[in-house]
């Protein structure tokens, strides 16, 4: 974590296409450094907010570079505690509510966000859901990153979660 003259920052580097770097610069010139990340890439801005919230920082320094880091620019983002806590709670809710699917980003599979989504085929095309402990009705998230199998009454290692067992039963919402 680089230290500025008075405040320690979370540091991050994003590598992007030249076109996106130019877009970043236009936003920075128009809106100023502190507003740039949010306008340029909202997902990155939310990530930055969560890094600051959980790390105990109030500033984030993001370097955006072209491929090979031949050209770069940077911006500073300040912690917006209320918004960071909102997104942290939203993520906790998603984990706690494993039997509910989050709302689709779009009803159209051709929406920009859906075109690049790893779950497009499941969400829009009816592809089968991968069978593993995370998709099984008997598994539940517990404290931290761990999962518990209620059928076998055991904590599940990451390796065991990926393999599952022969008694796997898809969550109702995924069936």
Where do the language-model regions lie?
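Active-site beta-strand-loop-beta-strand hairpin of nuclease catalytic cores
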Residues: 1-17
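BZIP DNA-binding basic region
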Residues: 20
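Metal-dependent nuclease catalytic regions and adjoining charged, substrate-binding loops involved
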Residues: 23-31, 35-45, 50-153, 161-175
